[in-house]
């Protein structure tokens, strides 16, 4: 059956720009491209088609395909990271930066967010807040590994997608119970995306009416004097 908006699929992909890989679900490909992150969780991801869990051009490409489809798709800037916007290149006083600014360095600048230092001219620092991939045409090689229909697997996939972690989940009588790993509330990624996970669990996964997050604390063992 052809994939449609709202379907969950397990997806593998590798994205490249000008022949250089910038993103992939394949750990070996990441190592080969020198973009490997040891702490990252590699392997196929679960996405809900139409929800922009991947860039627009790849998301739209999945509609009408079948499980097992493997293909390449060319994605133009308007359906990838957009065109470059000159207004997103800003100048700041060097004194605004706590450390010596260096060309190519990624920095966070207040409400503007994260950008790249593109030049340092005297006492001024030029920061580009465009995505490094803005204005570029991308190529994705992808494979639809399978269509997911089990609500439990759909919800577990959302958690993995946003939190970057596998978590123990049980689903019964409309209640999803998530056992949180120790120390999760110190994880910035979890704190950032927890609300989104809950929202999409209710909105996108059929049959979930209640979500319970279980966090267990243990009394520290006393050391012998």
Where are these regions (language model features)?
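FKBP-type peptidyl-prolyl cis-trans isomerases
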Residues: 1-225
């Amino acid at each position: 059956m052809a994939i449609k908006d709202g379907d969950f699929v397990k997806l593998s992909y590798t994205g490249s720009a000008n022949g250089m890989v910038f993103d992939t679900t394949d750990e070996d490909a990441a190592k080969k491209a020198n973009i490997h992150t040891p702490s990252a969780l590699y392997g196929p991801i679960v996405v809900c088609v139409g929800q922009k869990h991947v860039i627009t051009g790849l998301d739209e490409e999945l509609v009408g395909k079948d499980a097992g489809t493997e293909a390449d798709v060319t994605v133009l800037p308007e359906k990838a990271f957009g065109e470059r916007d000159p207004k997103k290149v800003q100048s700041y006083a060097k004194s605004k930066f706590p450390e010596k600014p260096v060309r190519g360095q990624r920095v966070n600048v207040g409400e503007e967010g994260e950008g790249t230092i593109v030049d340092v001219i005297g006492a001024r620092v030029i920061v580009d807040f465009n995505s490094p991939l803005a204005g570029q045409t991308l190529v994705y090689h992808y494979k639809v590994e399978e269509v997911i229909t089990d609500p439990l697997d759909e919800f577990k996939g959302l958690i993995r997608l946003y939190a970057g972690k596998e978590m123990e989940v049980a689903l019964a009588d409309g209640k999803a119970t998530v056992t949180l790993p120790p120390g999760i509330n110190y994880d910035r990624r979890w704190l950032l995306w927890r609300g989104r996970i809950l929202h999409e669990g209710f909105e996108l996964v059929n049959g979930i009416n209640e979500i319970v997050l279980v966090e267990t604390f243990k009394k520290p063992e006393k050391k012998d004097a």
